[in-house]
């Protein structure tokens, strides 16, 4: 309650300050006094925010036994707007409980909701790296270059999605996995790399066949009624080549990480573990598989003339290249269509914009569920997904040894 009361006071305080600026200009107040006034207001604001903010990073404090097999993994969380150290601790504790791994929270300190939103606009529209971005960059880069870890999992929420789109280093990315919730960013990149990273004498044909994305896996989770996601990820995934990664859109409202996202997508049971079944993960979807990708015509086996929002999802990065076909995280052409008529307008959407496939032709369908496409779901309760990227590197090394 104290934290909430401070935030409410800051909203009123900051709005009053912003409203006073045009009044001061109209009254032609002395410039020196105006600067002193602004400095005083911002100084008081920082003192108040000091009650909310804490150290640069926090570690989860859940008292559970972690399997030794997870010692080579590093989980990092970057919070969104208006999150002080208390709420950050609650977020990383919930994540640690969900995935049974220690989680480090890199604190994106709050300056109050109004000023935080202004910072979001600065970071997103001008790609400006604030001090928060630089601190987070150092934490992630240190983890990537640390030989003690062979997998780095980055979880981003809200404004953390903006900062994550700015801080991802351009080297050592094969160890990195990124999962976002309510992403407020306007872009998310994932450049290509090929086996020449590991093999010096690979020929051009083999290289083309093994071109993959630099970051092993990117997934974005969003609520259709989350206003932050609406002017962030749900808006900019419509633009080709701007947002890479698989998108999971759940019908629903709310933006808070624990209360709205994790409780809906990774609900806990009475024993403190993630339930094996929940409404969102059990949503039935249809994966369209390619039969002939060289034809100019496209045909859907689902009902024609589906309305907007019915569940038809497209690959959106607009590249048409057979060398990349069927390589995007197990989705043959990354076009998924909702199959449960009883759900209606509340259908869950899954979109894989990692896929470079432009044309979808003569498909045959197979029914799967949301959980079958969610890699993050495979981490629940301390489990792990198959190490696909590591297997690829090992196979590449074996091929090099045989040449």
Predicted regions, residues:
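N-terminal alpha-helical membrane-insertion module
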Residues: 1-67
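Amphipathic alpha-helical scaffolding segments
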Residues: 93-94, 169-170, 238-240
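Structured alpha-helical bundle/scaffold domains in large eukaryotic membrane-trafficking regulators
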Residues: 56-60, 111, 193, 197-200
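Short secondary-structure boundary/capping segments
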Residues: 121, 193-197, 235-239
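Structured catalytic/translocation cores of nucleotide/phosphate-coupled proteins
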Residues: 76, 128-136, 143-154, 167-168, ...
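Serine-dependent carboxylesterase/thioesterase catalytic core
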Residues: 133-232
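C-terminal catalytic-base region of ester-bond hydrolases, centering on the histidine
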Residues: 212-403
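Active-site catalytic motif of lipid deacylating hydrolases and related acyltransferases
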Residues: 1-8, 63-150, 186, 347-350, ...
